[in-house]
Amino acid sequence: PVSNLGFLIDVSGSMYGPQRLGLVQSSLKLLVNNLRDADRVAIVVYSGSAGERLPSTSGSDKQKIREAIDELTAGGSTAGGEGIKLAYKIAKKNFVKGGNNRIILCTDGDFNVGVSSNEGLENLIEQERKSGVYLTVLGYGMGNYKDSKMQILAEKGNGNHAYIDNLQEANRVLVNEFGATMHTVAKDVKLQIEFNPSQVQAYRLIGYESRLLKDEDFNNDAKDASEMGAGHTVTAFYEVVPAGVESNFVNKVDDLKYQKKVKPALQPTTGSKELLTVKLRYKAPDEDISKKLELPLVDNKGNNVSSDFRFAAAVAMFGQLLRDSDFKGDATYAQVIAMAKTALDNDERGYRREFLRLVETADGLKQ
């Protein structure tokens, strides 16, 4: 679809430097190179106040857009709330029905003038998202970078969030994965897993602590959830304890002091050999009523797993080590590296090897 984009750029003093505003400028010019003639871009900047630096301009006039980006300089305080309001106002003015209407916020998240509290910014963006304009948040800088705030803003704005620390990462997000970053194909996407108790006696979702939903929210179309872009994939790992297997993590509850322990009655099961059922709900980008899909899975008891699965498992293990999870077991950085090295056969762009370097760096810092 045709894109109506608004670059909302933080040019406050905290964004000074080649790895902040300098990298923002280089990143956005990568995106500009891929604009079509029918696409349009406006540029809004904010520091002590907000202003329109470039009115909505055709993608055919790339040089004009690049020049406006190159002219940006950093200095002053950070009126992020004012900038967000102006960016949404301009995006709504140039709204393309059936198009990709999106604000791209580039910042370190250090809002300190006007609407700057987490709650105030969340409420502002929750109101603005009703217009059908999506929000992509690109984070820059180290030290005072507010990662949690950026993630929350993206979630409230029906959008996505990425951290850009070098030009290679900018190229990945804004060029190689342009469709997944910029084009929403499904909104309010929800997943619900039902395990068969005759096959699984206990389970644990690894990660996603900030994305959990109540069971009843799965069928509630008023409940906000995640958006997915073109070519976007999502991976969720569950750790399970098969039925009949002894585990230290099952039934670790003290006996009641004032009541007799009563063995719970066994729930009747259907006798199904299915391991689980995956339930998916989603809405089309321009619709408000969700669709539901269900897919059962039978465990074939095989140990052959794909390289993608092994790599994702290595990433999950790495995450548990970084946060020193109580459930990390005997996992080590060496095990993460060994597992990831068995899954490098599908790494044309070198992202998996970059992950290996991150793990090796983390291991070195720990020592």
Regions inferred by a protein language model and the residue ranges of each:
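Beta-strand signatures of extracellular beta-sandwich domains
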Residues: 42, 190-192, 279-281
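Short aromatic-acidic-glycine turn motif
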Residues: 51-54, 197-204, 287-289
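Generic beta-strand hydrophobic packing signal
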Residues: 138, 203-204, 208
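Long, acidic serine/threonine- and proline-rich intrinsically disordered regions
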Residues: 200, 208-235, 240-367
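Exposed acidic/Ser/Thr-rich ligand/metal-binding surfaces
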Residues: 1-189, 216, 248-268, 346, ...
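Extracytoplasmic assembly/pore-lining segments of large envelope/extracellular complexes
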Residues: 181, 185-188, 193-204
